[in-house]
Amino acid sequence: MADEELQPVPAAEAAIVPSGPTSQWLTENGFAHESLAADKNGVEIIKVEADFLLPIATALYAYGFNYLQFQGGVDLGPGQDLVSVYHLVKVSDNADKPEEIRVKVFLPRENPVVPSVYWIWKTADWQERESYDMFGIIYEGHPNLKRILMPEDWVGWPLRKDYISPDFYELQDAY
């Protein structure tokens, strides 16, 4: 009996993350996703496959997440995935403590393609363009997906961790 109490907990059991209220709502309504651990502020985080982003984003909008506060990219390191991150907020009369959720879509480095959420939240316009410009994440269906910070002829994606910056870049027609 004493030996059984000292047995280590299997990693699969230790890694179980409790679902937050929004994740539970998505599960009840048949949306495929995975709950990740909440951040230090208690914001619920879910992982979504790229193919399911638009249906889930539409459902979250209908559920009351009417404001895309932030969309950005993350590079997990050379040879690893890129992540498209969406921070959504329920803006309502209860402005003291709005409900928030973060949606993460993990994408293969070789072909980082995800549907654009521009048609759900217009605030995604420049944010998706910046993620494209800096990380090379392609947002299918975006109405104007082109570089926003770097010159159009820039080669590469400057915020990728495996990016090698050129020794010299000539500015043309600078004045």
UniProtKB/Swiss-Prot annotation:
Name the record gives this protein: NAD(P)H-quinone oxidoreductase subunit J
Assembly and oligomerization: NDH-1 can be composed of about 15 different subunits; different subcomplexes with different compositions have been identified which probably have different functions.
Record's bilayer topology term: Peripheral membrane protein
Record keywords, A-Z: Membrane, NAD, NADP, Plastoquinone, Quinone, Thylakoid, Translocase, Transport
HAMAP family: NDH1_NuoC (MF_01357)
InterPro entries: NADH_DH_suC, NADH_quin_OxRdtase_su_C/D-like, NADH_UbQ_OxRdtase_30kDa_su, NADH_UbQ_OxRdtase_CS
Main location: membrane
Organism: Nostoc sp. (strain PCC 7120 / SAG 25.82 / UTEX 2576)
Taxonomic superkingdom: Bacteria
Protein task: NDH-1 shuttles electrons from an unknown electron donor, via FMN and iron-sulfur (Fe-S) centers, to quinones in the respiratory and/or the photosynthetic chain. The immediate electron acceptor for the enzyme in this species is believed to be plastoquinone. Couples the redox reaction to proton translocation, and thus conserves the redox energy in a proton gradient. Cyanobacterial NDH-1 also plays a role in inorganic carbon-concentration.
PANTHER family per UniProt: NADH DEHYDROGENASE [UBIQUINONE] IRON-SULFUR PROTEIN 3, MITOCHONDRIAL, NADH DEHYDROGENASE UBIQUINONE IRON-SULFUR PROTEIN 3
Gene Ontology molecular-function annotations: NADH dehydrogenase (ubiquinone) activity; quinone binding
GO biological process: photosynthesis, light reaction
Record-annotated disulphide pairs: none
Localization terms from the record: Cellular thylakoid membrane
